[in-house]
């Protein structure tokens, strides 16, 4: 399915956030917000690949850049983007999925758990965490799991089985304790950057994109019933 790229400047305090939307050339119902990790920007190859894949299957996709290591700042920026989409007269979406890579997924999780209590119209439908940074390398005793336990809507984790910032058995234990319906897709032998020895980057991207699209479609199809 064809789509159109639209560049945006989203108000954030006295600043503007750079964003790019991929808008399918048909009636759209659902959108996905994506943002990058501690480094890079919205033009991270994997985010671009994922956005293109989702848009080609009929989903509105917005990527935005918010640089910096201050998680509070990142969370506020994410809230501004979510509010922009929710109040936009141009893109009248029935719902959105919040997503991000690494630090971006941590910001998305925080926004989701604070948004849900006031989300009377169920605008936020789910959370997509790519390489969620559950802990610092070699600091497995300090887990970033508090926000995850407060979320009630569906959550998809896509993580590498060799991720130095997300030990496999620890994420599985967290998922079991979450009140939200959760699913974990492990990319075998992938590290935090989703690099896998012996596999091409595009091959890994394809696996990730396929899993995320399938999960989103499962939820949106249930909404139609």
Curated annotation (Swiss-Prot):
Transmembrane segments: none annotated. It comes from the Eukaryota. InterPro entries: AB_hydrolase_fold (IPR029058), KANL3/Tex30_Abhydrolase (IPR046879), NSL3/Tex30 (IPR026555). SUPFAM superfamilies: alpha/beta-Hydrolases. This is Testis-expressed protein 30. The lineage of its organism: Eukaryota, Metazoa, Chordata, Craniata, Vertebrata.
């Amino acid at each position: 399915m064809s789509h159109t790229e639209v560049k945006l400047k989203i108000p954030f305090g006295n600043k503007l956030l750079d964003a790019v939307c991929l808008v399918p050339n048909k009636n759209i119902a659902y959108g996905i917000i994506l943002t990058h990790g501690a480094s890079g920007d919205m033009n991270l190859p994997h985010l671009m690949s994922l956005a293109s894949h989702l848009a080609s299957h009929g989903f509105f996709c917005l990527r935005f850049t918010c640089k910096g290591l201050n998680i509070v700042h990142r969370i506020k920026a994410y809230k501004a983007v979510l509010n922009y989409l929710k109040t936009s007269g141009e893109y009248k979406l029935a719902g959105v999925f919040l997503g991000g890579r690494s630090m971006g997924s941590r910001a998305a999780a925080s926004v989701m758990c604070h948004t849900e209590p006031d989300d009377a119209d169920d605008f936020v439908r789910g959370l997509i965490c790519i390489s969620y940074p559950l802990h610092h390398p070699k600091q497995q005793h300090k887990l970033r799991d508090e926000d995850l336990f407060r979320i009630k809507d569906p959550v998809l984790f896509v993580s590498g089985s060799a991720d130095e910032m997300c030990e496999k058995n620890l994420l599985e234990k967290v998922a079991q304790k979450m009140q939200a319906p959760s699913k974990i897709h492990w990319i075998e032998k992938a590290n935090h950057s989703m690099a896998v020895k012996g596999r091409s980057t595009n091959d890994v991207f394809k696996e990730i994109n396929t899993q995320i699209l399938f999960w989103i479609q499962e939820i949106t199809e249930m909404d139609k019933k």
